[in-house]
Amino acid sequence: MASEQENTADFGFRTVARDEKEVMVAEVFHSVAAKYDLMNDLMSFGIHRIWKRFTIECSGVRRNQRVLDLAGGTGDLTAKFSRMVGEGGEVILADINASMLKVGREKLRNKGIIDNISYVQANAEALPFPDDFFDCITISFGLRNVTDKNKALRSMYRVLKPGGRLLVLEFSKPIIKQLSTVYDAYSFHILPRIGEAVASDAGSYRYLAESIRMHPDQETLKGMMSDAGFDSVNYFNLTGGIVALHRGFKF
């Protein structure tokens, strides 16, 4: 008989049933999809582009490889990977949320980025791909929204080729006390107001702030990746630990 903890999950600071969380997270991203890119620029003052560029640099992706951009949303990383793998490679943009996938597809097609990209609606906990399929997997600002993170990490490990690498770019825990104080004030008081003003949705951005606080810290996530089977797991603190990039290999 499953324990109460096994049947529940965090939705921000609230504890909800696991299946309820998936529905609630879906509603958040259906709501924010149309304004997602604009809000990313406003919320991070454009710094998210630097974080993503660093992720690309750490990916080791080469021509003719196959890449999974998981929880790929509006396709920022997919666009870069598409050019890196070339005509002989493939990038799969996967997202559980149909609205985000639609925005990403339209954005990339409007930029003329078409030929080597596929779009798949997929749950990170049960990826619909064969074993040992991808040379590289990235999940950017998506893992904290997954209900069962350990299950998702195991699923990523399964579909990654031996010699491949996983990159997890995610909000984390500031390593400077003064920065943490300022960051909390910004996240809980200013961010929801920006969400209300720009996207008419303070609630979704309040969830964003809460979900960041509930996400595992740097060392905990490193341990989770190791437990899922990844080797040589390390991480890089970015912007004082506001964001961390975790990298693990499958040998």
Curated annotation (Swiss-Prot):
Keywords: Menaquinone biosynthesis, Methyltransferase, S-adenosyl-L-methionine, Transferase, Ubiquinone biosynthesis. S-adenosyl-L-methionine binds at T74, D95, N123, A124, S140. The keyword Methyltransferase applies. SUPFAM superfamilies: S-adenosyl-L-methionine-dependent methyltransferases (SSF53335). GO terms for biological process: aerobic respiration; menaquinone biosynthetic process; methylation. One of its GO terms (molecular function) is demethylmenaquinone methyltransferase activity. It comes from the Bacteria. It catalyses: a 2-demethylmenaquinol + S-adenosyl-L-methionine = a menaquinol + S-adenosyl-L-homocysteine + H(+); a 2-methoxy-6-(all-trans-polyprenyl)benzene-1,4-diol + S-adenosyl-L-methionine = a 5-methoxy-2-methyl-3-(all-trans-polyprenyl)benzene-1,4-diol + S-adenosyl-L-homocysteine + H(+). Pathway: Quinol/quinone metabolism; menaquinone biosynthesis; menaquinol from 1,4-dihydroxy-2-naphthoate: step 2/2; Cofactor biosynthesis; ubiquinone biosynthesis. Pfam families: Ubie_methyltran (PF01209). PROSITE patterns: SAM_MT_UBIE, UBIE_1, UBIE_2. Its EC number is 2.1.1.163, 2.1.1.201. NCBIfam families: MenG_MenH_UbiE, PRK00216.1-1, PRK00216.1-3, PRK00216.1-5. Methyltransferase required for the conversion of demethylmenaquinol (DMKH2) to menaquinol (MKH2) and the conversion of 2-polyprenyl-6-methoxy-1,4-benzoquinol (DDMQH2) to 2-polyprenyl-3-methyl-6-methoxy-1,4-benzoquinol (DMQH2). Belongs to the class I-like SAM-binding methyltransferase superfamily. MenG/UbiE family. This is Ubiquinone/menaquinone biosynthesis C-methyltransferase UbiE. It comes from Pectobacterium carotovorum subsp. carotovorum (strain PC1). The lineage of its organism: Bacteria, Pseudomonadati, Pseudomonadota, Gammaproteobacteria, Enterobacterales.
